[in-house]
Amino acid sequence: MGLQTVNVIDNEKMKQLYQRSVVFFSDMILALFPAQWFSLDYFHLSTTMQEIVISVTILTAWLSSFVAGYLTNKFGRKLVILIASFVFTIGGLMMAFAHTEYVLLAGRAIIGFAIGLASMAIPVYIAEAAPVHIRGKLVSTNVCFITFGQFVASIVAGLFSNDHINGWRWMLGLSAVPSILQLIFFTFLPESPRWLVQKGRYDLAYQALTKFRYANTVEEDIRTEFASIKESCLNSERDRNNSKSIKAIVSNPMVMRALFVGCLLMIIQQVAGINTVMYYSATIIQMSGVTDKSTAVWLSALTASINFIFSFVGLVLVERLGRRRLTLSSLFGVIISLLILAAGFQLAEINSPPVSFNPNPNDDSICSRMRNCDQCVSSLICGYCFSENTKSGNKDLFVSLLQTNKFNGTCLPKNPATQLPFANSSFCVNGTRHSMMWTESWCPSQYSWMTLAGLMLYLFFFAPGMGPMPWTINSEIYPLWTRSFCYSMSTSFNWFFNLLVSLTFLTLTNLLTIYGAFYLYTFFALIGLILFYFFLPETKDKSLEEIEFLFEQPLCQLHKKRQNLSRFHNVDSTVNVSNENVNPSITTSSTNDS
């Protein structure tokens, strides 16, 4: 694609822009992701407390996303990002030095507040500072750094997986490093030009826009772009003056269509199961039959690396295929991979290892009546004990029998007196018999490869499309006068459904089985594919001022291409700029407005 002169940008400056503005998300996931395994083990939390500690971050992120729109509109995108970085640092350090579960809980709640602010402010900041031809790529880079954070977090978890005492402290403490870096470096970036224009600070806005454009760009081209931005802001201000309430926003069909599409994108992203896959990847891998916990952690790092690598494929495709085609093709692949993932778990359940031995023939407990491993681990009070070593010859008769076949096993009651993963009696009663394996949540399976293949394919298809596109499209489709509010609303939907899916995953696996849960996610993804085929417009190669007029059409016609959308093609930039007393002598060498 040829570059328009007005869209030419200093690659080094924009590189600094997105590196500094998205490093936060590496931090975000580093604190959210696998350290929870080890920190929860350290504090020996009850099941209820575990759910609270895991979910409180998402809950506070959801709540803070409601106020993020007001704060970014009132105080600016830059200041909110700086505040989020500072708060994130405090939360990370609190978790690292936590000596009670309540301090850990408070630290995760504080981090959630920062995440909610940043997840709204950062994409909007990038979209408002970037030129048209690479806006989608830069906003998508934001999501790429989320996947980078997941990858780094998985590597860190693997490195510290053998340290069950203090390893989790290092994982959580390291999360403060990227937020400190962002707090320092982001200080030197200017505020969003569009926000400055909206506040009437035209000189500072022109300086900021100049700093985001290539040093040799013809000044007239920058002035033309600035005039387009200014006229859009003036129109938005008039709309704002006539639309002081949420009722006015709701009564605006164009805004409501855009908000519907934006929120739907966020909802489908979550109900397609992405954060279930990422939060519980190591657990899913264990549930597929991988027995060693350390191996499961490293395999989860492999899945995170696939997510990270292929998210960068989206950077290439977003400006070539466009947002619409990339989203639809990504969802189609997600549906196929979810079917494979669900089928793998279903085959594993159908062929679940039998309960071959009962060490206490007179025992008539619930556990003794279980017929296979799947029934056993589905119970809240039982676990499955089997041999990892297939060699016989052990002096213990039952152990010898178990060792003749990896898929022989016995169902035993859990030990209610301890949080340690041992049975209450008989085999697996303690950790001294290293040949015996004890599981309360998964079963050994010969179909592990199928589940892992589905998991890898899921990330292969999700990462380039449904990962970044909801954030990219939401940063583009709202008019300036309501952008902060609408983006805040769509972000709130994202975090709410993130929380809902994460909280219900284990419940769904109990009610529907794990493969039933993934079939349900497949159904949601299919519904999303159908809806987006009709409701999702293409925003590629359109300015933010042009995009809002896409939604003049009814929802069912949004997928159709339209031409000549812009009301700004014939803007007399010289008149518009000079009327607002913008100093024409301002050049790219102007000092930075922090």
Residue ranges and their predicted role:
Residues 222-233:
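TPR/TPR-like alpha-solenoid helical repeat scaffolds
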Residues 212-224:
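Short intracellular "coupling" helices and adjacent cytoplasmic loop segments at the cytosolic face
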Residues 1-212, 234-594:
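Alpha-helical transmembrane bundle of multi-pass membrane proteins
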